[in-house]
Structures are given as C-alpha cells and as structure tokens.
C-alpha cells in the first residue's frame, strides 16, 4: 500500500519509519563524528571513514558536512561501506592537493534491521 494512503488514513506509527512495503522499520539514531581527511589530490575524490558500531551495508546513513569544511572541498555523500564503517566522500576540484584538518560531521543512521 502506498505511503500516502497509509498516512492519509492515519496509520502512521510514531517512532517508526514506513518502508516501501508498508512495514514499519525501527532504528533511528543520530550523532556526530570527528574525522580528519587525508590529503586529497587535485581533481580527485577522496574518502574518510568513521566507526559506527552496528551499522550494516543495508542501512541508510545521512551525513551533514560541517559549516567550516574547507571551502574548496565538495561533500559528495556518505555510505555504510562495510560493517561498522561509514565512508564520507569529498571531492577536490582544485589544481592542488588539499589537506584539511579534523572536522565534525553530523549523521542520522536508519537501522533497517532493528
């Protein structure tokens, strides 16, 4: 059943997320992670990881970059790349390498198996 029909009929479960099949999936968590990206070469996408215990590659991670991220780096998204590991992807479009300092990213983790 489409989510719109379920919501319009008032069948929303507080504290849960309605999946594509209409089932309610629980497991929403949020927090911050301080990461220090290694030097990213010119015109290259790099990645940096942090540990998120319990995260699985089938889960959903939403990451928000910090407002003080180096102006020349472009945040390209994030993914649970392995069990307990989140990868944050950054792109350097400039003509020289960028070695940014440690930054604090915020995240929302949706545990699809909880």
Segments from the language model and where they lie:
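Low-complexity "stalk/linker" and mucin-like segments enriched in Ser/Thr/Pro/Ala/Gly
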Residues: 69-80
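Short, flexible beta-strand-to-coil junctions
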Residues: 65-70, 112-114
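Short, surface-exposed alpha-helix to beta-strand junction/turn motifs within ectodomains of secreted
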Residues: 55-67
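Extracellular receptor-binding modules and their adjoining Ser/Thr/Gly/Asp/Asn-rich linkers
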Residues: 2-55, 83-87, 91-114
């Amino acid at each position: 059943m489409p989510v719109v029909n379920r919501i319009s009929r008032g069948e929303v479960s507080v504290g849960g997320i309605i999946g594509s099949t209409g089932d309610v999936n629980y497991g929403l968590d949020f927090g911050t992670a301080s990461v220090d990206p290694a030097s990213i070469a010119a015109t290259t996408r790099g990645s940096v990881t942090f540990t998120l215990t319990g995260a699985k590659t089938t889960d959903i991670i939403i990451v928000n970059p910090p407002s003080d991220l180096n102006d020349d780096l472009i945040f390209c998204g994030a993914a649970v790349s392995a069990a307990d590991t989140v990868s944050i992807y950054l792109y350097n479009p400039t003509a020289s390498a960028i070695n940014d300092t440690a930054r604090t990213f915020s995240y929302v983790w949706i545990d699809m198996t909880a």
